[in-house]
């Protein structure tokens, strides 16, 4: 993990600006940059037929930070990828419980969905705010990206499902259920998706048509979770009736029912790497891992003191499973390491038993605990696609990021997330006043990030300020003002009728003779206005009155004559390039700019002018 410098290096709280004003200096923000570790691994690794990694091995010293490797470089060492270090806590200015957290497919941003129906986008490297938008009218309960990374679907408490493009352009909305939707999942081909609702049913929809194809009925109570196997035509669902069911999506038939829990099922999830296991969690303080080949549970995950609310598999290590509890605790399990506490004996795994069909499931305790990860229930967990950062969303309205500790970082086990605020304050690893000050600084940073947020290029541009209300013309979008009153009709003039006769003849009009040329005025070389006024005085031509109307000509009825010295308003001076850029960087609660508009903007600046 690197650090982004924000301000000077002296540790002061501020300094003098160029104009002598006091300038507040922000502290450094933690930034995770995985580019260096990926490059280091790609540079030093050897081909498969010549052996493995040839670089320096990591050791518990800060000097070995440069030798850190990504999880893909150590697939068989899941213990090195356990996220024990707290990186950052992100929170909105207007706080709501976080129901779902999802990394974007490329891993550059984290998308969170709250009970207010809003999408919030956080930067995946610096964890700062990027944009926010109102996506649903009610609480968002589920999010899922397609396997092709081209689509995002979301479901809310009203039973609606919405289609989104990667730039968060809402394409379609369908009313899938009349009750809240608790979970949804894409099929391996992305041609269909399935929803689980409180009406106790599962529904399979055709993604392209947005129409329901089949309804899966069999649960006796609310369906709380559903998942589609990553490579096979197999569905799994968990319900409030304590049952886990496996379904055939082609025939809508229930294949089998797994009886392993004694309370409401909170999460069911297939393992994505090998696809041979299924993890389930429930409100009975346990989680279970089922082997689909044996159709039985092989691991019983213990250790939680409260109910388990969610779980997630690691994207690289198939034996690393993380769970979140109703009390805000975050536990990490290695399925091949039972890790029993003192006083508990080892149990035999079904794989090692002579009769694997009758032996009970092996009890597994957490390899690492973060008891105080959140203050309230953890509703969602999601791993970065590379597997080096875990994001958690909680009922305490905070989104937190977790990662592995750097070599030599031993104080991570003594922070307030591991031992609590009181114990950490007693040991001097956390200050209550400093914690409040840090929270205020984080909120201030998020407010400043909102000011620098992404811009919606499709938003209407504001009118030119400074123009008064001209009759018959709009006011250019001035705040708080409407359009001007249209001018009254002129008596005797109808739509399409002839213009009224003038009360006096004007030279050159109505067949009259043109005005005589002014003496000393060359028609081929017009003079400047000052010279023209001087010639008009010498020729005896009367100057126009201050009202800018010829003598005898009255203004139209209903419009007062302009006062003396009246002139058109001076247009505002053109904005500089810097001011125009600042005016454009105004936060709008709207979708992200489209890629096409962004490309045009870059091309106008002289970038990306040629195809690559």
From Swiss-Prot:
WD repeat residue numbers: 93-132, 135-175, 177-215, 218-257, 260-300, 303-345, 373-412
Keyword flag Nucleus: yes
Compositional bias annotation for Pro residues: 486-506, 544-575
UniProt feature coiled coil, ranges: none
TM helices/strands, residue ranges: none
CDD domains, alphabetized: WD40
GO biological process, one term: mRNA 3'-end processing
Region (Disordered): 1-21, 424-450, 486-514, 544-612
Basic and acidic residues composition-biased segments: 430-442
Places the protein is found: Nucleus
InterPro entries membership: Pfs2-like, WD40/YVTN_repeat-like_dom_sf, WD40_repeat_dom_sf, WD40_rpt
PROSITE patterns reported in the protein's UniProt record: WD_REPEATS_2, WD_REPEATS_REGION
Protein name per the record: Polyadenylation factor subunit 2
Organism the protein comes from: Gibberella zeae (strain ATCC MYA-4620 / CBS 123657 / FGSC 9075 / NRRL 31084 / PH-1)
Organism placement in taxonomy: Eukaryota, Fungi, Dikarya, Ascomycota, Pezizomycotina
């Amino acid at each position: 993990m690197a650090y982004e410098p924000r301000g000077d290096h002296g540790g002061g709280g501020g300094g003098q600006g160029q104009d002598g004003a006091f300038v507040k200096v922000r502290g450094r923000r933690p930034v995770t940059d995985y580019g260096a570790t990926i490059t280091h691994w790609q540079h030093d690794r050897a081909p498969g037929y010549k052996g493995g990694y040839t670089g320096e091995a990591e050791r518990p010293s800060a000097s070995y930070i440069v030798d850190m490797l990504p999880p893909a470089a150590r697939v068989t060492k899941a213990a090195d990828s356990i996220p024990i270090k707290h990186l950052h806590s992100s929170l909105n200015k207007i706080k709501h419980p976080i129901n779902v957290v999802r990394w974007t497919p490329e891993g550059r941003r984290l998308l969170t969905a709250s009970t207010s129906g809003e999408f919030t986008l956080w930067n995946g490297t610096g964890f700062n705010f990027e944009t926010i938008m109102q996506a649903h009218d009610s609480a968002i309960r589920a999010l899922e990206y397609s396997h092709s990374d081209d689509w995002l679907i979301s479901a809310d408490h009203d039973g609606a499902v919405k289609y989104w493009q990667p730039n968060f352009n809402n394409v379609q909305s369908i009313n899938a259920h009349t009750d809240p939707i608790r979970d949804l999942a894409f099929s391996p081909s992305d041609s269909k998706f399935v929803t689980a609702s409180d009406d106790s049913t599962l529904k399979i929809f055709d993604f392209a048509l947005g129409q329901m194809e089949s309804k899966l009925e069999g649960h006796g109570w609310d369906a709380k979770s559903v998942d589609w196997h990553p490579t096979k035509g197999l569905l799994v669902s968990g319900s409030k009736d304590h049952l886990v069911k496996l379904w055939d999506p082609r025939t809508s038939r229930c294949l089998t029912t797994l009886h392993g829990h004694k309370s409401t099922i909170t999460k069911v999830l297939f393992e994505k790497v090998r696809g041979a296991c299924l993890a389930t969690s429930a409100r009975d303080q346990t989680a279970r891992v089922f082997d689909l080949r044996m159709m039985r549970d092989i691991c019983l995950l213990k250790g939680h003191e409260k109910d388990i609310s969610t779980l997630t598999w690691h994207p690289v290590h198939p034996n690393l499973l993380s769970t979140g509890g109703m009390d805000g605790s975050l536990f990490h399990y290695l399925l091949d390491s039972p890790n029993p506490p003192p006083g508990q004996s080892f149990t035999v795994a079904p794989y090692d038993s002579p009769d694997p069909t009758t032996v009970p499931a092996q009890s597994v305790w957490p390899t690492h605990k973060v008891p105080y990860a959140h203050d309230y229930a953890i509703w969602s967990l999601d791993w970065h696609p590379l597997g080096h950062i875990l994001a958690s969303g909680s009922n305490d309205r905070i989104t937190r990021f977790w990662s592995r500790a750097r070599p030599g970082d031993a104080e991570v086990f003594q922070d307030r997330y591991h031992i609590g605020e009181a114990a950490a304050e007693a040991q001097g690893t956390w200050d209550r006043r400093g914690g409040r000050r840090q929270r205020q600084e984080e909120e201030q940073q998020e407010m400043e990030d909102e000011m620098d947020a992404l811009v919606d290029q499709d938003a209407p541009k504001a009118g030119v300020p400074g123009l008064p209300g001209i009759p018959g013309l709009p006011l250019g979008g001035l705040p708080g003002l409407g359009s001007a009153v249209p001018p009254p009709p002129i008596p005797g003039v109808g739509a399409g009728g002839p213009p009224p006769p003038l009360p006096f003849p004007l030279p050159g009009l109505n067949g009259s003779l043109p005005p005589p040329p002014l003496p000393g005025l060359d028609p081929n070389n017009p003079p400047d206005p000052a010279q023209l006024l001087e010639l008009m005085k010498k020729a005896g031509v009367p100057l126009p009155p201050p009202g800018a109307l010829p003598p005898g000509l009255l203004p139209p009825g209903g419009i007062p004559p302009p006062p003396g010295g009246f002139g058109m308003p001076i247009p505002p001076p053109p904005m500089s390039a810097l001011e125009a850029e600042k005016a454009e960087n105004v936060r709008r609660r709207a979708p992200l700019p489209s890629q096409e508009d962004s490309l045009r903007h870059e091309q106008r600046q002289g970038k990306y002018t040629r195809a690559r």
